[in-house]
């Protein structure tokens, strides 16, 4: 949660107000914010089970990182293709606030492809887990299929 986690991601976000970030910086910010939150939830659950080894924990971390980033990519996509009533916030607000987004950097189609690639990365990471990962797989799919 500190400077190497969510706080660091928030610092990047606040420092970027009115500026356009490059793709690497945008990804870093989102990995530290949403990615760190999802990583904590996934890995803490695994650690509580006391049945995972370091390799499995790393795979769950990769899963969480991919899903956290996919969530942000989908959020940026929805800001363009959805509507205010569905989103629960003003549609197009990212563009109005001059925020760096994946569609702005990659184009809408490129952002959609990025979200799908991150889903595939997440699902591939779960292959290292010898336990039932069905709920994690469903969550991963939900992240890029959600409408709000």
Segments (PLM) and residue ranges:
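All-alpha prenyltransferase/terpene-synthase fold signal
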Residues: 1-148
């Amino acid at each position: 949660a500190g400077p190497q986690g969510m706080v660091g991601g928030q610092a990047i976000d606040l420092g970027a107000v009115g500026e356009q970030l490059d793709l690497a910086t945008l990804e870093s910010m989102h990995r530290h914010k949403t990615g760190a939150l999802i990583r904590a939830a996934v890995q803490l659950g695994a650690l509580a089970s006391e049945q995972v080894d370091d390799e499995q924990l790393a795979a769950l971390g990769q899963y969480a990182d991919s899903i956290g980033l996919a969530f942000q990519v989908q959020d940026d996509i929805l800001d363009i293709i959805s509507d205010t009533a569905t989103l629960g916030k003003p549609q197009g607000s990212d563009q109005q606030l001059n925020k760096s987004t994946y569609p702005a950097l990659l184009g809408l189609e490129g952002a959609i492809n990025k979200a799908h690639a991150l889903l595939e990365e997440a699902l591939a990471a779960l292959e290292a887990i010898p336990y039932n990962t069905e709920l994690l797989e469903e969550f991963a799919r939900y992240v890029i299929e959600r409408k709000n």
